[in-house]
């Protein structure tokens, strides 16, 4: 009998303990699907499209650069 066999237990390994850890709550004001303690049920949150203002601004900047390059 080897030393390895001597150190092994005869019974089955017990299952690992169940973890009671939960994730931290979301930041204040962050919309969730679950109502919090004592909160009033709110309607569905709708998002609004911000449009393509970023792309229009980039195109305007490129046009200005090209116009300045041509003029000077």
Swiss-Prot record:
Sorted UniProt keywords: Cell membrane, Membrane, Nucleus, Transmembrane, Transmembrane helix
Cellular component, GO annotation: cytoplasm; nucleus; plasma membrane
Chain ranges passing through the membrane: 49-65
Localization per Swiss-Prot or TrEMBL: Cell membrane; Nucleus
Membrane topology term: Single-pass membrane protein
PANTHER family, sorted: PROTEIN CYSTEINE-RICH TRANSMEMBRANE MODULE 1, RCG49325, ISOFORM CRA_A
Family: Belongs to the CYSTM1 family.
Name listed for the protein in its UniProt record: Protein CYSTEINE-RICH TRANSMEMBRANE MODULE 1
Lineage: Eukaryota, Viridiplantae, Streptophyta, Embryophyta, Tracheophyta
């Amino acid at each position: 009998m080897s030393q390895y066999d001597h150190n092994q237990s005869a019974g089955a390994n017990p299952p690992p303990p169940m973890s009671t850890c939960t994730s931290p709550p979301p930041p204040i004001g962050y919309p969730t699907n679950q109502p919090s303690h004592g909160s009033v049920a709110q309607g569905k949150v709708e998002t609004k499209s911000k449009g393509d203002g970023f792309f229009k601004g980039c195109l305007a900047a490129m046009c200005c650069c090209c116009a300045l390059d041509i003029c000077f």
